[in-house]
Every structure is written in structure tokens, then in C-alpha cells.
Amino acid sequence: MLFLIFLSLTHVNADELFNKGKEVFLGAGNCVACHMLSDAGSNAMVGPNLNEIRPDIQRTLMAVKNGIGVMPAMEGILTDEEIEAVAHYTSIAAEQ
């Protein structure tokens, strides 16, 4: 029984993280301005098409924190929680 409760809570937390990541992608992170991602309704072509490259969480964390190419580093602009959320969101949304 406790295992089922844990699974339920984990699913809720994952959903919350996904939703928070989408908020960051569309809002504070302004990722939507440069990156194509179908789930976000973004058709931008400045940065990589996330639907095609399907970045994993670690790759996204590094790029968002440190910047890459013309993409600026967002560490210090976004909170660690926002960076984690947007990395979680993009890795899952790009797989859909």
C-alpha cells in the first residue's frame, strides 16, 4: 500500500515539474523565442529544434546553466529549480 502511495506522489511531483518547466520555457527562460518544441507551440528556428535533437536532461542542464553557442548562460537568471524544471520538461516534451 505504501508503495502505491509513493508511486502516486512521484507521478504528481513529475507532473508538477513538467508543468513548471513548461512555464519556464514559455516565460522566464524565454526558450520559446529561439527553440522549436511542438508541445510548447513554438516554431522558432534560431536555436536547435528540440523535437529533432531530443536533448536529455543532463545535456539541457549544461546548456541552460552555462550557455552554448549564441545561447546565453541562464545560471543566476533562472533559479536552480527553474533550470531543473525546464530541463525535465524539454527532455520529456521532445520525446512526445
What residue ranges belong to the model's regions?
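Bacterial N-terminal signal peptides
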Residues: 1-8
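Electrostatic cytochrome c docking/interface patches
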Residues: 8-26, 59
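Inter-heme linker and motif-flanking segments adjacent to c-type heme-binding CXXCH motifs
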Residues: 16, 41, 92-96
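Gly/Gly-Pro-rich "capping" loops immediately C-terminal to redox-active cysteine motifs
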Residues: 22-23, 32-68
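C-type cytochrome heme c attachment motif
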Residues: 26-36, 69-72, 84-88
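C-terminal capping alpha-helices of c-type cytochrome domains
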Residues: 76-96
